Amino acid sequence: MSMNRREFLKTTAAAAAASAVGISIPSEAKAAAENTQAGWQWDKAVCRFCGTGCGIMVAVKDDKIVAVKGDPESPVNRGINCIKGYFNAKIMYGADRLTQPLLRMNDKGEFDKNGKFRPVSWKRAFDEMEKQFKKYYNELGPTGVAVFGSGQYTIQEGYAAVKLVKAGWRSNNIDPNARHCMASAVVGFYQTFGIDEPAGCYDDIEITDTVFVWGANMAEMHPILWSRVSDAKLNNPDKYFIVNLSTYRNRCSNLADMEIIFRPNADLAIMNYLGREILKRNAVNWDFVKKHTIFATGHADIGYGMRNPNSPHVTDKERDTVAKQVAKVVTEEEAVALSPIGKWKAGDEMQMTHTAGKKPFWHWQISFDDFKKAVEPYTLDYVAKVAKGDPDESLDSFKRKLQKLADLYCDPNRKALSFWTMGFNQHVRGSWINELVYMVHLLLGKQSQPGSGAFSLTGQPSACGTAREVGTFAHRLPADMLVGNPKHRKITEKMWKIPEGTLNPKVGSHFLKIMRDIEDGKIKWAWVHVNNPWQNTANANHWIKAARTMDNFIVVNEAYPGVSARVADLILPVSMIYEKWGAYGNAERRTQHWRQQVTPPGEAMPDLWTIMEFSKRFKLKEVWKAHPQAKLPSVLDKAQAMGYDPEMTLFDVLFNRPEYRKNFPWPDPIAKNPQTGKLHANTEAGGDGRTIIGADGKEWKGYGFFVHKALWEEYRKFGLGHAHDLADFDTYHKVRGLRWPVVNGKETKWRFNAEYDPYARKYAKPGEKFAFYGPLLKALKRGDLKGPKTKQKYSLKNKAKIFWRPFMVHPEDPKYDTKGYNFWLCTGRVLEHWHSGTMTMRVPELYRAMPEALCYMNPKDAKELGLNRFDLVVVESRRGKVKARVETRGRNKPPRGLVYVPWFDEKVLINKVCLDATCPLSKETDYKKAAVKVYKA
């Protein structure tokens, strides 16, 4: 059979499409498809990108991935991918892939911070890395070093990193970029339920009849989930109702039945309006509320997570905004919102007296009458006035929408499914707004039920599975345990077989504070894993300058030369997703594993290998000694009593354990491909056929045991019996993921509901359906809206909290700006690119589809400024400025007074402009709001 390229592409595409829908395939097309796939080895894997957790199938031939398709057996995506998903393979084959360690050196071959990058051996790289680490570790102690972790870590990578940093170095200065995306959601879960992660699952999409999308452009950021929402809507167009609530019009608006454009930060006011309406309409599910909830509130004067304005690093331009960290003038609209507290009037100066330490977290139980009093000022007239976000929409129209919103939530015959992502989480009151959406659902009793619940969507592929569940945050340990809890530290030390007292009880620096600590000279050695912090952190000019000009040493694990790699002193080339074994956990608590499919290029090695190899460089006597700076005693005597010699390395104690070698040999039957029976490679366990000279100067041949399985089986023990139960390693390689807790081989779809959750059945009272069994923060003092009144704490076992939190104005609201910064700036992602674009900008098809970041602007604003479409403009804030081209007809349509600039483009490094204010509870940065000027370049 003879066939040209065009005919071949046509027939293979037709064959694939026909097969997908069950149509018989012409023999010629079938033969063409079979010929081209000869010798391909298929295996299941997980998408590298967002937190949806789509299953994919990858095909390998001659040690290269030659095809990717959606996994038809995946219950998440059911065989389809989004545009990024189809290019999972191409991200690995960019022309400038890093394949050798690179160290800044002078002409003499010595490390020089101002030198040029030159290739070095792995041994030379680790020698310099060790030298610099020990210099600063001995100078500053455990608090002087840090690791920037990731929500894109595999679970095993994150677990190994936590062991090295917290058990090995006795530092808690490890924090993931998930701090930027999910920390507010975590605080909302902890504060409300006492345990992290969503109660529901993706099945809710098809079961519900009402979807509320709050600050979540699902059509671009979670496109596969949006396709499921779309399908459900099209199958039941008259009943299924979608509301899109956003600060600008986006692609979700196209399908939505109603769109509400609100003023940035005013979601707080809308939630309070809903709370008031639920009471006024007698829509409270009193049986649910009385049995399963209590009411609570906390302090309002908590600041905005900014630096002290007296810091020498705060510039004159920044100071007026940063001053609000200490005190602010209460506006007239805030005076109404805060009036139930009875402390502040319009024009008063609010001193931020509850900013330090745990004070922003303090909360106490209040009565229902106090709660009712608190929401009373949030009338339709008041909220419509403060919350309307589109100047061109009439007030009456906005009011009608708010009333319809309340109708939908309060309708007893409707289910209610609320989704959100960064619009809630990246928010100066992100923890509050998370608490308030639960307030609405709990009052209605529409929580933890099929089709009804408040559902936080995750942005990254393992922000849940690794960052949160493993505990790669500065304050966490595995399975929702906390470094500040003596009982939790003791459990962890026992599990890790390390001396009692090894773990540092003091919470480490969060992601943004690590940057500030580098600028302050408090941290002088930092290691970046699986993220791009010098592009993804707000107020980037400060952090880039500090990294490049101060006395410090920055190591970056990278696959491509992005912004952070170019800022670094040492770059370590690392494997990408299908060049290593791994596991991710997605937004519905589904854990999924994959096998290594291909060999990494050049000398690139897995992140896990770099962590374990670096652990060989530390003897116990160097790290488990006394650290006066951190007030940590020596645990060497206890270590010797456990049989550990001070000359042993952290590798010996943490990773190269005898039980690992005995119980998890390599090769392992689970590593055989289900289709061909061939053994998959495992770079860490047995080498991968390359001749790699390792960190010790010897040829790398593997650890000789199944590292990933050993780490998994140890890690999963943390959650067994504690409502975080995970299945064994082999099971995950036989299924398309499981939603934890996995008890007796069965996954859990809806948590806290005794009909579906074995832990809810265990803890619920006889005859009751729900038990909110999370153990954290389940004893509170009692008081009123002004503060706690009792010294005693009262148990809230198995109950959730209904919070009241007030509306407050953002610290950089253009409405109150007197310096000419008259536009809101919002930033975020786009469909075609992932985060900082380091991977996706190297895929030709994705680059062509979206080659640069644009400044999306309302046409009326553009006309007023004398701007035409695609004109080059300057977007300037108090912190910095960038140039971008104006787009007035694009997919994102801001109201007048707001511009949207995505952050995937390092040439439009918008984080130089963004404000580094955070939610004071979660420490998550508010990337969605800053005051800017826009003018022609």
UniProtKB/Swiss-Prot annotation:
Its cofactor is [4Fe-4S] cluster; Mo-bis(molybdopterin guanine dinucleotide). One of its GO terms (biological process) is Mo-molybdopterin cofactor biosynthetic process. One of its GO terms (cellular component) is membrane. One of its GO terms (molecular function) is molybdopterin cofactor binding. It is found in: Periplasm. It is an enzyme of class 1 (oxidoreductase). Its main location: periplasm. [4Fe-4S] cluster binds at C47, C50, C54, C82. Residues 1-31 form the signal peptide. It catalyses: 2 Fe(II)-[cytochrome] + nitrate + 2 H(+) = 2 Fe(III)-[cytochrome] + nitrite + H2O. Its EC number is 1.9.6.1. Mo-bis(molybdopterin guanine dinucleotide) binds at residues 84, 152, 177, 181, 214-221, 422, 426, 532, 580, 607, 827-836, 911, 928. Substrate binds at W903. InterPro entries: Asp_de-COase-like_dom_sf, CT_Nitrate-R-NapA-like, MoPterin_dinucl-bd_dom, Mopterin_OxRdtase, Mopterin_OxRdtase_4Fe-4S_dom, MopterinOxRdtase_cofactor_BS, Periplasm_NO3_reductase_lsu, Prok_molybdopt-oxidoreductase. Residues 40-96 form the 4Fe-4S Mo/W bis-MGD-type domain. Predicted to be exported by the Tat system. The position of the signal peptide cleavage has not been experimentally proven. Binds 1 [4Fe-4S] cluster. Keywords: 4Fe-4S, Electron transport, Iron, Iron-sulfur, Metal-binding, Molybdenum, Nitrate assimilation, Oxidoreductase, Periplasm, Signal, Transport. It holds the Pfam family Molybdop_Fe4S4. Belongs to the prokaryotic molybdopterin-containing oxidoreductase family. NasA/NapA/NarB subfamily. Component of the periplasmic nitrate reductase NapAB complex composed of NapA and NapB. Catalytic subunit of the periplasmic nitrate reductase complex NapAB. Receives electrons from NapB and catalyzes the reduction of nitrate to nitrite. NCBIfam families: NAPA, PRK13532.1, TAT_signal_seq. PANTHER family: PERIPLASMIC NITRATE REDUCTASE, RESPIRATORY NITRATE REDUCTASE. HAMAP family: Nitrate_reduct_NapA. This is Periplasmic nitrate reductase. The lineage of its organism: Bacteria, Pseudomonadati, Campylobacterota, Epsilonproteobacteria, Nautiliales.
